[in-house]
């Protein structure tokens, strides 16, 4: 693995971030978006500088699900020198990691990968609670299996929200009730529109599936597109359907 070629290195960002917070007048006890993003951007700066130092490149870890929802810090983990996972949805990432853990033949590596799979998805930008991860992504933005379902039918077929809502009711029957499906469908559209500005300046990356959100590929969308326009036309349809379902 890469760890056999390159020396493992851990860089503590605490002091650098604290100095930065003091410089901009950020209260460290206020765990707001500045508190979170300051850490994310410090991580990226370190990675970029280490890459320069070693004549290398920063490989982005963000996947298509995160890009669709804008679940990335602008100029933080949003930025890299090559976004290798840019067209791989989060649900597929899990399967790929599990497959490699099963087949790699390296027991030590497999143990680490299984542990990663058992860990809640999180940017870990907030202090832990009782020694456990407090910031769980799917508690905040919703289940990735729902969002990946929505994304596929939006990008591959261009279906309207009402149709996607009906399809999700069938696909996830017994797993999510109608109210939950509707809640996260609205979240998906709100974030998909409002976060286009992050996708408009994505690093290069491959397209490996049937859909992608790169501005140089499948998705050409203005950053100032308003979800309000869509909501006036379509987003109320699932609410009407919920009343009659």
Per-segment meaning from a language model:
Residues 4-232, 236, 245:
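ATP/NTP-dependent adenylation/nucleotidyl-transfer catalytic domains that generate, transfer
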Residues 241:
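Extended, polar beta-sheet/loop recognition surfaces of beta-rich domains
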